[in-house]
Amino acid sequence: MSYNNIRTISTQVIGIAVTATCLLFSLASFAQNSEMQAIEDSVIKIYTTQAAPDYFTPWRLLNPRQSSGSGSVIAGNQILTNAHVVANASYVQAQKHNDPQRYQARVTFISHEADLALITVDEPGFFSDLTALGIGALPDPHEEVSVYGYPMGGKTLSITKGILSRVEQQIYAHADAFLLAGQID
């Protein structure tokens, strides 16, 4: 075999190896993008109409106000959210990511002490194209994390990436209790 033939074969092998490597990176990127899309689709915007009790005249309610918050689809066709999002709610709606339609929802469980609540949507098919997100282990400090949600004042999904710099007990305003909280930098 001549030097030119060996050079051509080795160039072809290197070309195939580079192409295969790029393909692997593309597949990994595609898998990562589809996983991110599934997470984004499983984050729900929650709209509520709330009427808190008037503690000075307990037979009356304060004027209703509207607010919004975030929730995540979990197993059992449930949406996990914070109790402060649905506390004193007389009307609850859920809106999927990139879907203008709002669906009537109802609270199925609330724990003010843990500031957690479960809601569901009875509309047939609401959960059919959504992936239930699992509840994982507590991340380690210095681990990169992503936070998805609809913070106050935002109409579109917010995604924040950062490093979990610490996890410690902090007082939660809703329950006036010490619970675990993480700081992301």
Regions found by a protein language model. Give the residues of each.
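Gly/Ser-rich catalytic serine loop of serine hydrolases
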Residues: 63-72, 130-136, 152, 181-185
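Active-site region of chymotrypsin-like
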Residues: 42-48, 53-55, 60, 122-132, ...
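Bacterial N-terminal signal peptides that target proteins for export
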Residues: 2-17
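Conserved active-site neighborhood of the chymotrypsin/trypsin-like protease fold
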Residues: 52, 75-157
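Residue-level preference for beta-strand/loop junctions
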Residues: 65, 99, 156, 178-180
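N-terminal activation segment of mature serine protease catalytic domains
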Residues: 31-72, 79-82, 91, 140, ...
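Bacterial N-terminal signal peptides
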Residues: 15-26
